[in-house]
């Protein structure tokens, strides 16, 4: 039976619903295909349909194997087929679309490299795109974007954020540093202004005081003239001649010495015109440019110079207000910063940790203020170096620094250079003697070390005194005991510079001994004594009585005997006339292994010679040193008996020297330090010159009387010259003994007997 109208009416809505559902499903499939869903792409289906059309086989078709398609004629394909099936207007965009769906161009690796379909043919292939597998079209989908790119973009974004943070921190640190520098510049500028103002005020005060002093001196001079005129007018006529003579001898024609000296002092202490002009220029510059505003006084440095200003004087100059101005706040004077700072492409994240940052200011609110007109560096220039004040006059002193230690010599030369002195250096005493022999008047002062190779400082001083008796020689040593200083002064040294020394100590000695070269000679009077009685061990406290050998000084050098220093010829004559059996007080037991001594003058009793105040018992600095105690008389040795009658003194000296040398050779033994004491060679005739192991010419010592010695084995100290009999290496100072032995010197113990004083050339402190 046909359906009724009611039934037909109910079936129509159901069909419409089914059609709508089918349409929705088709739309969803299309959306899925466009979005890379489970359905195949419309582009792939169009491509497959185009290849199925036999009318296009001459332009585009499947390959022989059916696993790829070939575009035979590129131009026809672009003009006729692409516009009909695709929305591409050129072949390049079509190839890019194929690449998006993972189609790849087939490249032929034959010998000729040409496609079998022609030279202009383009062949494309996909693993799922085949002529006999239409059902595989759903597997061909558009390639999704790689997730790595998104991750890289996120990392780049994070890196850019870190760079921005690092740059902002660096900018903040730079701003804080700039604020700190502005604060310091402000304080320096304000301090400089105050100092210039104070100096100008002090100059005005000094000028006023000089004027007042001149007025007082003129007034006193006029009063002195009136007094003298009144005294001359009241003299009686009978006594005119005598009064006139006394008037002339009393100095009526000349002013009082006090007034004359005051005028000289005022004339010497004159202002430096160039410095005054520079100060005036700065003062005028500051007044014209104005002063910077003063920040809140939160620390003591802001008011330091204001509190130090003298009462009754103006602390600041006119035109220099110290009022806070908010418009000059350094925070408002910063360099402008962009809102979005640019990032350097070459900036990497590993560089952020290498950026220097300064610590933030503890109180960044306290900032400086700068003046509206800044003073450029060209406006304020320091004075030239050659215009700096020197303490010397036209001639600068020339100093010879004798020191074997390179470090000490470098420091001393630097100090002397800063004191505006010309410096020459010598490495040992022998080199210093050669310098003096070349030009004895070249040097104004000599700093002499004591312990040196080749020739020690005392021997070098004794030889220099033969050529230059007046040049000041200052010993540089750490031994500043009284007995040591007596030895230095005895052989011609003028002063002692204790090691380690300073620039002030060296300057004080230069002012003392070169006062005639100073601009202001009166400044030398203010120099104090370098050595005090607390620093000195007075002579004779550690010296024991002993008989001594009398030796001639090094190369006939003068030595301090009872007569003190004198010309070398006088000393040599005194030595020649001294009898070999003359007793002499023992010199102080100094730190040298050999202590040079000298014979007393003829006819002078040894005890009186020891008690007589000589130049060796008083140093040039004025420190009184105790002379050595008188010796204990001992029984003379047969080897030192008086010469027989009729024998000249020279022959007696030679005979006694030979006898003493033989006795010393027989008494050669082990020293207290364990070194074998070598027997001395026969001494040459008196007055001859011999060479030490280092090649230093020295004088030959006279024979000395031999004594019984004390219970402790007192030994007679030798005379100056190379190490010889009668010398003992002090066992308590092994480092000095080792240095002496390394220099080639031998050590022979006296064992209680006085031996010929051949002398010492290598004194050891």
Curated annotation (Swiss-Prot):
What happens on changing residue 100 to M?
A: Abolishes the binding to SSRE (SLN1 star response element) motifs in DNA, but preserves binding to HSE (heat-shock element) motifs
Record region (Transactivation domain): 542-765
What is the annotated quaternary arrangement, including any partners?
A: Homotrimer.
Q: Which residues form a coiled coil?
A: 157-198
Q: Extract the ranges annotated as region (DNA-binding domain).
A: 40-145
Instruction: Point to the regions of Gly residues compositional bias.
Output: 550-564, 755-765
Kindly provide the name given to this protein in its UniProt entry: Transcription factor SKN7
An example Pfam family from this entry, by short name, is Response_reg
* Low complexity composition bias: residue spans: 11-35, 569-584, 637-647, 699-715
* UniProt family annotation: Belongs to the SKN7 family.
Give the residue ranges for region: Hydrophobic repeat HR-A/B. 160-220
Q: Sorted alphabetically, which PANTHER family does this protein's record hold?
A: HYBRID SIGNAL TRANSDUCTION HISTIDINE KINASE J
* Any one GO molecular function term: sequence-specific DNA binding
Which Gene Ontology terms describe the biological processes this protein takes part in?
Answer: phosphorelay signal transduction system
Q: What does this protein do?
A: Transcription factor that is part of a SLN1-YPD1-SKN7 two-component regulatory system, which controls gene expression in response to changes in the osmolarity of the extracellular environment. Under low osmotic conditions, phosphorylated and activated by the phosphorelay intermediate protein YPD1. Also activated in response to oxidative stress, independent on the two-component regulatory system. Regulates heat shock genes in response to oxidative stress and genes involved in cell wall integrity in response to osmotic changes.
SUPFAM superfamilies from the xrefs?
CheY-like, Winged helix' DNA-binding domain
Entry's transmembrane regions: none
Q: Which Gene Ontology terms of cellular component type are present? A: nucleus
Residues recorded with modification 4-aspartylphosphate = 449
Q: Where in the cell is it found?
A: Nucleus
The record's comment about this protein's domains reads:
Homotrimerization occurs through formation of a three-stranded coiled-coil structure generated by intermolecular interactions between HR-A/B regions allowing DNA-binding activity.
